[in-house]
């Protein structure tokens, strides 16, 4: 490696400096080289453009994957709320047998009376989307008995019962089910807003992580160039000591400068690994086999192209498209729904009710009991007068041969204050509070956009200043090296110029990287709050909604 080569070169050249100082410096370089050599090399290097990084994040980022499930959860919530409108089918079958002990001569049996009854029922009931409720029930029965005085045995009965109830005031425009359905739809819209916000925030983080990695790599190159300059100065000074134009003590300063630059290289290499991990976590699937072994080589270099910034247009765009503002407006819409519901609940409970019942009976009709014959002690002898089967009975029910109907209105009104009035007062105050919070959030958004625009403009100026500083430092170092070569300079000033140039190069690289990141932030701040924050908007009647995040109650 490069460090090992430096150690070997220094060993071959040798110097006339003290054995103690030379051996200490060489040992430190060897230790640093050994540490670098022992680090595991990356198994694979992947060339990556910034657009490819964005596409990978859209496919594999865990945060986006998590948020993509939320709209599906909200779809289930809408279906759950709508399920209260689903019809409910009910069936029933029962059989009853009863044996009675006769307690009088007119009980209808000598020793006991056996009654047997079979009942079946089929019904459907439903709450309708406009607040009404209906129920339809069909019943049938078959009754047999040993009672001698019973007119029918067996007796068949059937009836159809229809009921309908329609709210006229309370629960007419909106009821609890319609409130839940409407709020569930708004929650579904909110999940889409939050998903788009998470995607935008993640892509912003990916782009910034990409530029951070690019900066770390360029910074390492700058530190390596500084190290190479200091090593060249060390070699030049060693030659001057050999020919007697420089004191041996000046070698120590050169060695110290090399060691200091070596430390900066080590730190720069560690920063690259940290930047690699940060980008890796944003764009790769942790379940992939090469998650930790692959490293990235950015193919897009951070460029500096001055761009005009229209702050007013950006503020207008943010006020129209910011996810936290959209979430806040969504919460106000939910508050409107809740206010409408509670305003309706303070109205009188007036319902129109209609009931329609049609019945029919049949079976085997027996002749009347001859009580005169019974008085003489003759046995009871009854004959079949007529028979009507189940089909005839069902026909009577369908044709409404024996109808029974009822139409009525029920009115209910609580005396004194009630819970609905308190709820309405509460949600109105919360709605007013939420409107003020929205105005405050709009002010925060405008401030954030202006700050982001100011950062872009500041970084533009930083790049120009840092570039000019780097060019001047290059000229300064060149002048000091010429003076040193002519025997008119000092080692201290050469090393100072090298350090200044290194700092200037790092500052220029940092300024260009910060400029590109500020452009990313300026675009993102018009869509999402930077840092995933945001305000809190109170949703009247349903708790608190975090704006700009993904927390709801």
Label every model-predicted segment.
Residues 65-69, 82-83, 129-157, 169-193, ...:
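Sec/SRP-type N-terminal targeting helices
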Residues 114-120, 156-160, 403-405:
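Residues that define the transmembrane beta-barrel architecture of outer-membrane proteins
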Residues 23-117, 164-179, 183-185, 210, ...:
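Bacterial Sec-pathway N-terminal export signals of envelope proteins
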Residues 91-97, 136-142, 352-358:
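Transmembrane beta-barrel strands of outer-membrane/channel proteins
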Residues 81, 193-313, 455, 459, ...:
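Periplasmic alpha-helical coiled-coil/stalk elements that build and connect Gram-negative outer-membrane
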Residues 3-9, 19-22, 99, 279, ...:
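Acidic, low-complexity, intrinsically disordered peripheral segments
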